């Protein structure tokens, strides 16, 4: 693999938060039991004028600002989301104009549950590596859905992350990648349905754990990595328990996982989930650090990446772009009625 990697990153988390205990009280659940079950204290909620498009735009603008490159040098843009405002109309084309990209650009909305943004990353890497484009961008953004009263409601949240890929000015060089995919019916949403469904027992062992472990072990066996090689490990975060447990199953010390865990404070941002943890690590990483990144998407599949941080990251970290940690602290709490209003879940019938 020729030299290619992350040139810049940008993240966006809506300011609004609803506490898990607030949701639990509405549905008669024991708040302490729910918090302990999912290890999610609160989740981010998009504002009434926000959606996956505005979230993607904000994250992408921050990535461009940090990179200090002309937007017209971006030759491809990919958007991964489960929260498209339009059934037929791409978000990626909206971003082309909103970001001031050239019209001579590859633009595609990706689909693979929570790892669609990760697939966009590999697509961008391939085009950059081939020499067809100078820079590529992938965005993972969601305003994820959870049916009222159903357990997904405790974690489904909103946020976005954008990554710029290139050869020049690399902050995290891509060393290796490995993919593990199978037909596993753990989670789905049919056409026209407002909320997803999940296969209960399929969401754990057969889906999340099997695929993340399959991708990570496959990568380690193919390229000769050991758990001790990684400074940080970031996994998909559907709740606070799963990433910690999968790290233990892979013999990766919890100290390497905790710095990238954000789900406790903002819930599961779906396509931005693992990427948000990755962005948080990039905000603090030092040259020479090695990062294991393993997104997961229901249906099901996982990609395992290894990045090595370069000296260039020190310059990128000095910009005034908000860090993930700053956004985690910048919040406004809302109650359940405001939550329903902001998520447009109150329907009026004639």
UniProtKB/Swiss-Prot annotation:
Database matches in Gene3D superfamilies: 3.40.47.10
Protein residues bound to (3S)-3-hydroxy-3-methylglutaryl-CoA: 30, 114, 155, 203, 236, 245, 268, 298
Keywords: Acyltransferase, Isoprene biosynthesis, Transferase
EC main group: transferase
Record-listed E.C. numbers: 2.3.3.10
One GO term of the biological process aspect: isopentenyl diphosphate biosynthetic process, mevalonate pathway
Catalyzed reactions per annotation: acetoacetyl-CoA + acetyl-CoA + H2O = (3S)-3-hydroxy-3-methylglutaryl-CoA + CoA + H(+)
Assembly information from the UniProt record: Interacts with acetoacetyl-CoA thiolase that catalyzes the precedent step in the pathway and with a DUF35 protein. The acetoacetyl-CoA thiolase/HMG-CoA synthase complex channels the intermediate via a fused CoA-binding site, which allows for efficient coupling of the endergonic thiolase reaction with the exergonic HMGCS reaction.
Name of protein: Hydroxymethylglutaryl-CoA synthase
């Amino acid at each position: 693999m020729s030299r290619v990697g992350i040139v810049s990153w940008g993240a966006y988390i809506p300011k609004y938060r609803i506490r898990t205990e607030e949701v639990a009280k509405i549905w008669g659940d024991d708040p302490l039991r729910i918090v302990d079950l999912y290890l999610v204290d609160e989740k981010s909620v998009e504002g009434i004028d926000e959606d996956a498009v505005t979230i993607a735009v904000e994250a992408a603008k921050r990535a461009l600002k940090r990179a200090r490159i002309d937007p017209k040098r971006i030759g491809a843009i990919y958007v991964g989301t489960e929260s498209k405002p339009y059934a037929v109309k791409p978000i990626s084309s909206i971003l082309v104009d909103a970001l001031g990209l050239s019209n001579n650009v590859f633009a595609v909305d990706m689909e693979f549950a929570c790892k669609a943004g990760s697939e966009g990353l590999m697509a961008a890497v391939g085009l950059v590596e081939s020499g067809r484009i100078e820079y590529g961008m992938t965005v993972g953004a969601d305003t994820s859905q959870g049916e009222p009263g159903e357990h997904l409601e405790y974690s489904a949240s909103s946020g976005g992350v954008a990554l710029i890929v290139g050869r020049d000015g690399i902050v995290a060089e891509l060393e290796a990648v490995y993919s593990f995919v199978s037909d596993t019916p753990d989670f789905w949403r049919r056409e026209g349905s407002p909320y997803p469904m999940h296969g209960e027992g399929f969401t754990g062992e057969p889906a999340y754990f099997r695929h993340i472990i399959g991708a990570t072990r496959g990568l380690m066996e193919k390229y000769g990595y050991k758990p001790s090689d990684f400074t940080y490990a970031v996994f998909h975060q559907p709740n606070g328990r799963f990433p910690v447990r999968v790290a233990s199953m892979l013999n990766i010390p919890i100290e390497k996982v905790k710095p990238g865990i954000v789900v406790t404070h903002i819930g599961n941002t779906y396509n931005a989930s693992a990427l948000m943890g990755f962005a948080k690590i990039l905000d603090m990483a030092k040259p020479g650090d090695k990062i294991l990144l393993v997104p997961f998407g229901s249906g099901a599949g996982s990609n395992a990446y290894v990045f090595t941080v370069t000296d260039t990251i020190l310059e990128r970290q000095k910009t005034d772009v908000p860090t993930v940690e700053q956004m985690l602290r910048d919040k406004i709490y809302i109650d359940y009625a405001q939550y329903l209003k902001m998520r447009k879940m109150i329907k009026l019938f004639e």
